[in-house]
Amino acid sequence: LAYIAKKYQIQLVGGDTTRGPLTITIQVHGHVTKQNILQRSAAESTDLICVTGCLGDAAAGLQFRLGQLETGLLTDTDFEYLLQRLEMPTPRNQIGQQLVGKAHAAIDISDGLLADLNHILNASGKGAKLDISALPFSDALKKLPTEMATQLALTGGDDYELCFTATAGNVAKLKQQFPEMIQVIGEITEDVGMFYQNAQGEWQAFSE
């Protein structure tokens, strides 16, 4: 926390970081001009759904910390990387700032991709079709069974990557600015619900 606060020149003045008899919760409110607002509620049909970085690393790091991850598949370097992703996530501030004026809707992935993307869909009154094969995995996660890595990427939290929707043209511009950092994983649809393509090539709801 101290490292990140120093890097981004902010003051850490509290939070749920210690134990004690008294807990004080503070909300910070600010102002932003209308043209600079990035909301969850503005996704449009045919928008591409994108994420930054790699997904599932923090959840894998947590499973390792809890002794729930198969250790024979990964090296010590892999474990160090996964724990760093869990304990010291990288804020995507630079990309987030560039989304203003290019993305229609955005959210950080703290509760897992499916849960957080669903916030965008509910707020926007839209649906989504996801390409599961396009989920971005780190080299460490690629060493795990595909089904396990996919589950971690879809439902694991604490990645703090960004999920956003934008037109194909604006996604292309963002990819030029941030090569290898932005991955298209699906498309916004007018029909509500979240679907993926199964092994038979059929679209199936995640709830099924």
Model-derived features: positions:
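Phosphate-handling active-site elements
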Residues: 35-39, 70-75, 127-128
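Hydrophobic side chains in well-ordered alpha-helices
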Residues: 37, 61, 95, 117, ...
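Short clusters of hydrophobic/aromatic residues that line enzyme substrate/ligand-binding pockets
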Residues: 38, 62, 86, 194-196, ...
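Glycine-/charge-enriched secondary-structure boundary and capping motifs
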Residues: 1-13, 18-22, 29, 100-101, ...
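Short, compositionally biased
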Residues: 61-77
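Glycine-rich anion-binding loops of enzyme active sites
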Residues: 1-66, 187
